[in-house]
């Protein structure tokens, strides 16, 4: 049996709840290609992690790729650090960071330091990256201006520490505290508190910040770490599935997740992770990637952004653009060679402006699937499909079976 190639195409924040007319953006959107895929595939509903669990995009993607998020997800920090291109090692402690503005009493005046430019951030980065405190190496990389990632590398560290970011302005930078009684957590908290003071001393009168003050702009004179996580021991995708895999996405969080499990990240110009992303660029990149890779993960983020803004019409427009994107893809792939999963990672209902535990429609398309009677791709039609109701952990198992890659259990 020839082993087929696999695509998991995730529309971030796909699912929704019905409005007063009983409609969702997906049900109301004109999506002829998605409907055709549903008509030619096997449909159902999926909860990425489990029924009743509101997943983050990171934990949902891990689950769909067959990784137990309760075992390998330690926090957002490592994913952000991988996402900005840092080369992390097992045991590193990683954090998300903002450049921020504080006064001489460490009261936060601006959590984003007036949204400093990437060029300014790169200069300030040099003052932090490479520091050493109590035998622990400090690694820092800025990303998209005021954002960045911080990594501590050394012995006797723990991710069980609180945030330095108070998450509001007009209050002091939070003293970082251990979240358990371990010596490792106490040591890590002490190192971080020392680091923040050193960073302030190095950045406060830096030429970049002196120039910003002259222009009436807030100085970027501290970093605020949050979301601590330890880089886990994790089986790489190629070892786990014996497939060469890639990822196409625009958002740093998903890029970081992909890099953590060893997927090659394919960069697409104009792929922004927003409703204004380069949809067709991603579609063409997917078609090209299938010439080289056995497996491709695609994430398209725009619908989720629209949901978080509570913008029903924009979500509908994004879904229609994704449908055009899929039309191009399906003109260029062979049903005898590719198994295609179309789904989301979670629901983001317009009414909530946040993730919910509502299940997501899913369809699996390919030559050997048992086609059911579903003719539309939406939350209601897919509920009647022969795939019924599955969890994210089942997706890769189904693909491995369809492509002849799984092992028989028993005689």
Swiss-Prot record:
Q: How is its activity regulated?
A: Inhibited to approximately 20% by EDTA.
Q: Which Gene3D superfamilies match?
A: Alkaline Phosphatase, subunit A, Metalloenzyme domain
One family from Pfam that matches here is PhosphMutase
Q: Does the keyword Disulfide bond apply?
A: no
Looking up InterPro entries in the UniProt record yields: Alkaline_phosphatase_core_sf (IPR017850), ApgAM_prokaryotes (IPR023665), Metalloenzyme (IPR006124), Pglycerate_mutase_ApgM (IPR004456), Pglycerate_mutase_ApgM_sf (IPR042253)
Q: Which UniProt keywords apply?
A: Glycolysis, Isomerase, Magnesium
First-level EC class = isomerase
GO biological-process terms attached to the record? glycolytic process
List the catalysed reactions: (2R)-2-phosphoglycerate = (2R)-3-phosphoglycerate
- What are this entry's molecular-function GO terms? metal ion binding; phosphoglycerate mutase activity
> Could you say which cofactors this protein requires?
Mg(2+)
**Which pathway does this polypeptide act in?**
Carbohydrate degradation; glycolysis; pyruvate from D-glyceraldehyde 3-phosphate: step 3/5
pH curve summary: Optimum pH is 8.0.
Q: What's its EC?
A: 5.4.2.12
Q: Relate the protein's function as given in its record.
A: Catalyzes the interconversion of 2-phosphoglycerate and 3-phosphoglycerate.
Family, per entry: Belongs to the BPG-independent phosphoglycerate mutase family. A-PGAM subfamily.
Q: Provide the assembly information.
A: Homotetramer.
Protein name (database record): 2,3-bisphosphoglycerate-independent phosphoglycerate mutase 1
What species does this protein belong to? Methanocaldococcus jannaschii (strain ATCC 43067 / DSM 2661 / JAL-1 / JCM 10045 / NBRC 100440) (Methanococcus jannaschii)
């Amino acid at each position: 049996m020839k082993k087929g190639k696999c695509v998991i195409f995730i529309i971030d924040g796909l699912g929704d709840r019905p409005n007063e007319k009983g409609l969702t953006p997906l049900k109301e959107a004109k999506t002829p290609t998605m409907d055709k895929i549903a008509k030619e595939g096997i449909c159902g509903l999926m909860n990425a992690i489990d029924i009743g669990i509101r997943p983050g995009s990171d934990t949902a993607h891990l689950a769909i790729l067959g990784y137990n998020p309760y075992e390998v997800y330690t926090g957002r920090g490592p994913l952000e650090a991988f996402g900005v291109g840092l080369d992390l090692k097992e045991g590193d402690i990683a954090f998300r960071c903002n450049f921020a503005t504080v006064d001489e009493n460490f009261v936060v005046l601006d959590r984003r330091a007036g949204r400093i430019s990437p060029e300014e951030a790169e200069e300030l980065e040099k003052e932090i990256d490479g520091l050493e405190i109590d035998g622990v190496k400090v690694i820092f990389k800025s990303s998209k201006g005021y954002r960045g990632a911080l990594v501590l590398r050394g012995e006797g560290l723990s991710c069980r520490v609180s945030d330095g970011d108070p998450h509001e302005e007009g209050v002091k930078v939070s003293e970082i505290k251990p979240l358990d009684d371990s010596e490792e957590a106490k040591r890590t908290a002490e190192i971080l508190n020392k680091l923040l003071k050193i960073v302030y001393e190095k950045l406060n009168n830096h030429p970049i910040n002196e120039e910003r003050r002259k222009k009436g702009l807030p100085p970027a004179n501290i970093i605020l770490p949050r979301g601590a996580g330890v880089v886990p021991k994790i089986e790489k995708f190629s070892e786990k599935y014996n497939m060469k895999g890639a990822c196409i996405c625009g958002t740093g969080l998903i890029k970081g997740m992909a890099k953590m499990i060893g997927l090659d990240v394919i960069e697409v110009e104009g792929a922004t992770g927003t409703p204004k992303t380069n949809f067709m660029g991603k579609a063409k990149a997917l078609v090209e990637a299938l010439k080289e890779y056995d497996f491709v993960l695609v994430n398209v983020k725009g619908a989720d952004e629209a949901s978080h803004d509570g913008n029903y019409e924009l979500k509908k427009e994004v879904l229609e653009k994704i449908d055009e994107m899929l039309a191009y893809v399906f003109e260029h792939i062979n049903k005898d060679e590719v198994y295609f999963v179309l789904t989301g990672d979670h629901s983001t209902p317009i009414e909530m402006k946040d993730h919910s535990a509502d299940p997501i429609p899913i369809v699996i398309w390919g030559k050997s699937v048992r086609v059911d009677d579903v003719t539309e791709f939406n939350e209601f039609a897919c509920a009647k499909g022969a795939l019924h109701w599955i969890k994210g952990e089942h997706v890769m198992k189904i693909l491995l079976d369809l492509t002849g890659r799984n092992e028989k259990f028993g005689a």
